[in-house]
Amino acid sequence: MVTINLSPHKSKAGHIMFRSHMNKPAMFKYVWQVVRRHFAGRLMRLCIIALTMLGVQIIPAAAAPLIQKIGASLSHPWGMDFLDERHLFVTERSGNLYLVDLFTGSRNSIGNLPAVGAAQQGGLLDVAVLANQNSQEKDDAVIYLCYSLKIGKQTVTAIDRAGFDGANLTNRRTIFQANNPTARAIHYGCRLVLDQSHLYASLGERGNRHDAQDPTLHAGAIVRLFHDGSIPADNPKQAGWAPELFSKGHRNPQGLAVNPETGVIWAHEHGPRGGDEINIIQAGQNYGWPKVSHGEEYSGGSIGSGTKAPGITDPVWVWTPSIAPSGMAFYRGAMFPNLNGHLLVGSLKFKRLYLVVLEKGLPVRDAIMLDG
């Protein structure tokens, strides 16, 4: 039996202990790897789904966290998504993509990957899977990769679409390439999420903050494409906007999730010194960076005109001091009924998993579910 005690922050949430009655040590190895290293990606989804597969129950507990680590670590894992109940794609920032068997702990390296510009914050970042719901075959899935593409001495954020034959990506092609190349290897964003018809991708401003307000650039934006990479005709038609743009004014968004109750996209992004945000993404809206910010310069001092301005959509949640959010998921399921409809967010800075409690569709408080 594997036991995990989870001690949330002092709040009405109380203490929680996850207890498994199934012997799945190999799967737990990968749960722990993700929790321990807190990589950007679908951290929360892995924790919840893998624990669910372990046969987890929630019971009150007050003991200190007790987590068993089994197996080798990954090197800078960044993103992940499930191929099926048993198999998980995991990216390593250096350029590797693995298919992990959660029952045995084995992992296979996937071939025919794009060459990536792996430097500083760049590399092979997110992966998303569009599964064929009418088939049990792995090779019917469509795989999307978001990564930093090297162009001379510069890089851009790119997205590839491919099939999968069980060992290699097939018919891989680039369906999106950002139009703001720069030598600065930071703030790629690069989070992917799918709904029934669309692929959404978050794009950072690459450290060139004022590009987030340039309507012609993909910098500091959420873009929306169809699954095949074509551009929806009903994307916002704001003055001067590039046709792929869905929203603008973002700094470095590394969390995207579809609210299962509304179908609306939620995003979170890194602030500077304080001012990490959760935003509900609405077509054609400007989320303010760097005209406004709830954070301040790293050297001290305000940014822009304050926290509000005409024509700017306010965040629905702000963390100050920063938690460095990365990865986000809404929980929906029968295993943990108390979590239903609420949001889970990873923290790179504090190596934590946060529960963000929603009431009437908006965040009202948070609690620490995993710490350290």
Locations of the language-model features?
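N-terminal secretory signal peptides that target proteins for export/translocation
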Residues: 1-41
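N-terminal non-cleavable signal-anchor helices
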Residues: 3, 29-36, 57-60, 101, ...
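The N-terminal extracellular segments of secreted preproproteins, especially immediately downstream
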Residues: 29-31, 46, 184
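Bacterial N-terminal signal peptides
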Residues: 45-57
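Short, charged, low-hydrophobicity "junction" segments
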Residues: 58, 170-178, 297-304
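Acidic, Gly/Ser/Thr-rich repeat motifs that build Ca2+-stabilized beta-propeller blades
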Residues: 62-209, 255-258, 263-271, 321-363
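Beta-propeller domain segments
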Residues: 122-124, 132-136, 205-371
